[in-house]
Amino acid sequence: MSAEPAAWTTIARRTVVEDQWIPLRADDCEDTSGRSIAPYYVLEYGDWISVLALDGNDDAIVVEEYRHGAAIVAIGTIGGGVEPGESPEDAAARELLEETGFESDDLIGLGATWANFGNHTNRVHHFLARGCRRVAEQSLDDGESIAVHVLSLDGLGDRLSQSHHQLTWYKAMDWLGR
């Protein structure tokens, strides 16, 4: 029978890269049996949000954009980073407006999950936005090119290729009883 898992001890920690896009550190660790695990790389991102937005007809408002890491153009939920001092709820409302020009008076928190607890420090906060209506034009960051689509919920989960986008969809479908 194997030993019970236990937290490692961090012996040393150093920043490897820190710029506007990637905060990477290297930890030198030791497990409870004294084995060295070094370096262990950790990405220190801030929290993210993921929003499944529905219009008044319960159709999904989704975004489509190029994702360079995977080298694909993909459909996804509305998402982005939580700014310092901003609540996840405020970030969800802000990203919905910026990426799509839509807003909702019924933003429902669906819980949070770890982005990747193996080597990320951040969580993904999942939201359902109901009764969304277009109130503005998109307000995109430099380098963003995002198409907005209104699609049926039927089969949408199969079209979402990012894991936390799928999880947001599943959590929303569960909340809606579908």
Segments predicted by a language model, with ranges:
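Nudix hydrolase/Nudix homology domain
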Residues: S2-W8, V73, P84, T113, ...
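A short coil-to-beta-strand element that immediately follows conserved catalytic motifs
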Residues: T9, E103-L110
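Short loop segments at secondary-structure junctions
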Residues: T32-G34, D55-N57, Y66, A129-R134, ...
